[in-house]
């Protein structure tokens, strides 16, 4: 994949979530929950502050993150893979 996000944007590949209920029923369609976990594939250079300096991002390529899929999150298909483009502000945690 050859994509470079700008500024504080991050490219995330969503991780698959278990598609079975606790009772073993396979969930499909709207009953299947979308995961809010993913792996960071690419990061921008950083957030531009008011004084013009660039603040490096906290997340790095390869980090597993938990994110909020909000208004600014964009879903794109790149090289046959569905990825999410979001601001670092939409990332709530890094899973360690």
UniProtKB/Swiss-Prot annotation:
Query: Would the keyword Nucleotide-binding turn up in this protein's UniProt record?
Result: no
Q: Name its cellular compartments.
A: Cytoplasm
Entries under Pfam families matching the protein: Cpn10
Keyword Cytoplasm belongs to the record: yes
Q: What does this protein do?
A: Together with the chaperonin GroEL, plays an essential role in assisting protein folding. The GroEL-GroES system forms a nano-cage that allows encapsulation of the non-native substrate proteins and provides a physical environment optimized to promote and accelerate protein folding. GroES binds to the apical surface of the GroEL ring, thereby capping the opening of the GroEL channel.
Quaternary structure, per UniProt, is: Heptamer of 7 subunits arranged in a ring. Interacts with the chaperonin GroEL.
Q: Any idea what this protein is called? A: Co-chaperonin GroES
